[in-house]
Amino acid sequence: MALRLIAGAWRGRVLETPAGAITRPSAARVRQALFDMLAHAPWAMGGVVDRPVLDVFAGSGALGLEALSRGAAQAGFIEQDRAVLAVLQRNIAACRATAQSRLTAANALAPPQAPARFAIILLDPPYGQNLVPQAVTALHRTGWLAPDALIAAELGRDDPLPDHELLAERSHGPARLIFYLNPNR
């Protein structure tokens, strides 16, 4: 399956994906829906343009690189798997996005202290493990979230929702997108 960036400066660029079943890249239609909502919803405060974005459970980096392609100021990437990190580094280099990218090799549930705060947090964890609430708590505790950070997560359709007021929720086949503000502000 070819994984392509959908829009922006790098539209159509093919990204490498990790071999095997290590990751589950977001489907193009789900990524399109995510970024459409970030660009047009009134609560999204103008979307990714000129804002720092953090891609958590980054995998191939498709979400963070899509954000950069669409004008994000910078993208942080958190990924723990060494083989996946190598693919992510190659994708960042292929997009010539090294200067705009910060790659952190870490478990999203136990990240190091943040080098910066991020305004938009994109989470795409494995389905069925209820990792979003744990990751958001860990990211807050270590300083990754701006006080008014917008959190967007892709969950499995049957995954439990976080205990926070959602700004929006949309289903796309087996995936569900949720959006909410930093609950720790």
What are these regions (language model features)?
Residues 1-185:
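Class I S-adenosyl-L-methionine-dependent methyltransferase catalytic core
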